[in-house]
């Protein structure tokens, strides 16, 4: 029976927040398909936005092609939404992709833990609580009776907003409180914010910066300030479990390209921003204004660490909000970090943990 990811995504919206404990490794030799060229085809998905810097840059400068080598045929595909990525992965149309945590976890759960593996992180941070400059909001208690937008019911920012309200003695109306939390698509939230119909928004980049620059907003809280070390996951690199099992050497080559590109980005931020914005323009027809990409870049961190601990904390928040039902699902096999740690060890870098 064909999976319906979109139904799953609505039914279990908060599963982004919960991550299990076990790390899955794979050590079998790379199995090459018997095609006439003797090559492996790797179909890689990504989004043309600022939180997907590694594929945009690594594809543009040839790092991915060089590290994969002549025996791997790389096909890149762009997407605009996480559910579409998971549908493509389920259908066998892609093998790996950069993606946000919510659809990755939901896909893992729907497949019964069989199809999706997180093999690296890509971006941390990049979410802020923005308030209208003239809203009169200066402290947490001032949010009582106000309207706050989040991108989607149960997504990462939605959970963070509702949990933060609880930590500050408030509750959203859905849970018997006085704060009106409204899940609204980012573009629509920006329009309503500009009109003054919203007093606040817990938003990801580049939307947070746009709320400030276009909507007379100001930062009330940078979400990094509520996480240990300021790190929480925004973007992952995932791979199909089947591809990982059949082509572990190819996955390690991809991870080597990912890590090297991450290092280059962090060492050359100004150049990296320009390349990312050029990639966004090529894919979408419009680059981000310089002030927007500069602001968004400051508020996020490019990394290969999946920051798994941040998902465990979010899981506790999601469960407390009642979004995970009476029993937390078993996500114990979702992470496959052994290949990444082998690459990190080879490059003399600190290994990441689950």
Q: What does each model-found stretch correspond to?
A:
Residues 1-41, 349-354:
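Short, low-complexity disordered leader/linker segments with a strong preference
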Residues 32-183, 199-205, 216:
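Short, glycine-/small- and polar/acidic-enriched structural segments
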Residues 63-72, 225-230, 298-306:
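Short, solvent-exposed loop/beta-turn-alpha elements that line the ligand-binding surface or hinge
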Residues 79-83, 151-159, 187, 202, ...:
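Soluble non-cytosolic domains of exported or imported proteins
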Residues 316-354:
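Conserved C-terminal helix/tail region of periplasmic/extracytoplasmic solute-binding proteins
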Residues 135, 175-178, 182, 188-280:
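Pocket-lining segment of extracytoplasmic ligand-binding domains
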Residues 245-326:
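Secondary-structure end/capping motifs
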């Amino acid at each position: 029976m064909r999976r319906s990811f979109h139904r799953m995504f609505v039914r279990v919206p908060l599963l982004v927040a919960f991550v299990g404990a076990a790390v899955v490794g794979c050590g079998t030799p790379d199995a090459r398909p018997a095609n006439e060229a003797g090559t492996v085809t790797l179909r890689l998905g990504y989004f043309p936005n600022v939180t997907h810097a590694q594929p945009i840059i690594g594809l543009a400068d040839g790092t991915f092609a060089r590290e994969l080598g002549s025996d791997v045929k790389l096909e890149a595909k762009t997407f605009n939404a996480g559910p579409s990525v998971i549908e493509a992965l389920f259908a066998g149309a892609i093998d790996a992709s950069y993606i946000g945590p919510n659809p990755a976890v939901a896909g893992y759960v729907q497949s019964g833990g069989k199809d999706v593996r997180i093999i690296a992180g890509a971006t941390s941070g990049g979410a802020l609580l923005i308030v209208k400059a003239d809203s009169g909001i200066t402290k947490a208690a001032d949010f009582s009776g106000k309207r706050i937008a989040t991108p989607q019911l149960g997504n990462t920012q939605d959970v963070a907003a509702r949990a933060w309200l609880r930590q500050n003695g408030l509750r959203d109306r859905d849970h018997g409180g006085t704060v009106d939390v409204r899940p609204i698509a980012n573009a629509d939230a920006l329009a309503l914010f500009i009109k003054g119909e919203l007093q606040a928004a817990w938003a990801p980049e580049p939307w947070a910066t746009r709320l400030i620059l276009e909507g007379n907003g100001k930062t009330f809280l940078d979400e990094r300030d509520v996480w240990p070390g300021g790190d929480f996951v925004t973007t992952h690199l995932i791979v199909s479990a089947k591809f990982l099992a059949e082509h572990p050497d190819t996955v390690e080559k991809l991870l080597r390209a990912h890590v090297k590109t991450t290092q280059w980005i962090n060492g050359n931020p100004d150049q990296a921003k320009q390349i990312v914005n050029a990639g966004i323009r090529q894919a979408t027809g419009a680059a981000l204004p310089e002030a927007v990409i500069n602001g968004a870049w400051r508020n996020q961190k490019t990394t290969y660490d999946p920051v798994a601990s941040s998902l465990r904390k979010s899981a506790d928040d999601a469960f407390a909000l009642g979004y995970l039902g009476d029993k937390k699902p078993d996500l114990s096999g979702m992470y496959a970090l052994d290949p990444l740690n082998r690459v990190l060890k080879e490059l003399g870098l600190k290994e990441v943990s689950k």
